[in-house]
Amino acid sequence: MLNLYAAKWCIHCKKTEDFLKRNEIEYNYIDIEVQADDIVKKVIDVNGGFDWVVPTLEYKGIWRRGKIFNETELTGDLKKMGVSD
């Protein structure tokens, strides 16, 4: 299942979550503000050492760095990750 690493204050996280719901893509919402340090460190590492870069996505070990919401780009990235057709 797709993992969405996000924060409640992040508008791009909310837009990504709305997109996933609208497209009926199952996901786990992982609030990085309440996670163990090792999980937060992994998200930071995936994002090149930058702190609080969300939304970050992970699917079967394939990571997508946190980005500003762009529906076209997200659709393409999810296809590349194998999440959707």
Regions found by a protein language model. Give the residues of each.
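Local sequence-structure signature of Cys/Sec-based thiol-disulfide redox active-site neighborhoods
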Residues: 1-27
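Small/polar loops that bind or transfer phosphate-bearing groups
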Residues: 5, 31, 66
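Conserved beta-strand scaffold positions in the cores of enzyme catalytic domains, especially
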Residues: 27-29, 63
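Short, structured active-site "lid" loops
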Residues: 43-68
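Non-catalytic, surface beta->alpha helical segment in thiol-disulfide oxidoreductase systems
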Residues: 59-85
